[in-house]
Amino acid sequence: MASSSSNRSFLHRNANTFLTYPHCPENPEIISQKLWDLVARWNPLYIVCAREAHRDGNMHLHALLQTDKPVRTTDARIFDIEGFHPNIQSAKSVNKVRDYILKEPLAVFERGTFIPRKSCFQGNTPPFPKKNPNKDEIMAHIISHATSKQEYLCLVRKEFPYDWATKLQYFEYSANKLFPDIQEEFISPHPPSSPDLLCNESIKDWLQPNIYQVSPEAYMLLQPTCYTVDEAISDLTWMDNLSSQQMKDQESRASTSSVQQGQGNLLGPEV
């Protein structure tokens, strides 16, 4: 489940919504009807939903949802259905998105009338409330009614051509803030195998012989007076035994010291 911080940073605002449900075997008609009901307050106009097969055999769904009013929500779970969470994107080119959805479907469901958009200026953008609005009012109108990053930049270019040509980077920055890109959910190209071929050994089993131990060959490089591998093995064995004995002696002294300290703290008989 998404954290509260991720929910606060989520924002979807578009009249054309592209949804992908990974690993979802549900019927496209059932998903479409539920999505239609979910966006009833924004007046849905069209939906197409198709089921496709992954290369690993699992099913997934694609859906394009068009509404009369832009869907505005900060709820990242708004399109969750039957426990399936979709990847939510703004359809920048509805024609291409629809073609992509219908490329190789196993099952398809459509409802309503598809609304193609050949340019970002098409659509039912309301007129300006004033006859001669100032620059701030025009910009506020664009921010309120643009439904995608592309449409926002196109409207800015139309209303402020000089500013668009000289300050495009600032408008692109504001467009990215208004319509942030949504990261696609990662799907591993290597599905789990049977039996599991992943290596589950503890890293300690590798560290001990490979990092913490000195090989005879490395010891010979550090000791010019050591000429054979047998001599190196003998020296390393002696040092290992000596180190082990010293550690045991230290543990023994520490244990004895602790006992003696405890005995020294015992209370004597009352006088």
Curated annotation (Swiss-Prot):
Any one GO MF annotation of this record: DNA binding
Segments forming domain CRESS-DNA virus Rep endonuclease: 11-114
GO biological process: DNA replication; symbiont-mediated perturbation of host cell cycle G1/S transition checkpoint
Binding site for a divalent metal cation: E52, H60, H62, E104
Highest taxon of the lineage: Viruses
Keywords in alphabetical order: Activator, Covalent protein-DNA linkage, DNA replication, DNA-binding, Endonuclease, G1/S host cell cycle checkpoint dysregulation by virus, Host cytoplasm, Host nucleus, Host-virus interaction, Hydrolase, Metal-binding, Modulation of host cell cycle by virus, Nuclease, Nucleotide-binding, Nucleotidyltransferase, Repressor, Transferase
Catalytic residues (positions): Y100
Biased composition (Polar residues): 244-264
Motif (RCR-2): 60-62
Region listing for Transactivation, in residue ranges: 220-229
Region of interest called Oligomerization, as start-end residue ranges on this chain: 174-186
EC numbers for this chain: 3.1.21.-
Chain segments carrying region Disordered: 244-271
Subcellular location per the Swiss-Prot or TrEMBL entry: Host nucleus; Host cytoplasm
Enzyme class: hydrolase
Family: Belongs to the geminiviridae Rep protein family.
Domain comment in the entry: There are 3 rolling circle replication (RCR) motifs. RCR-2 may be involved in metal coordination. RCR-3 is required for phosphodiester bond cleavage for initiation of RCR.
Function: Implicated in enhancement of V-sense gene expression. Acts a an inhibitor of C-sense gene transcription.
Quaternary structure, from the entry: Homooligomer. Interacts with host retinoblastoma-related protein 1 (RBR1), and may thereby deregulate the host cell cycle. Part of the C- and V-complexes which are RepA-Rep-DNA complexes involved in the c-sense and v-sense transcription.
UniProt-recorded name of the protein: Replication-associated protein A
Organism: Maize streak virus genotype E (isolate Pat)
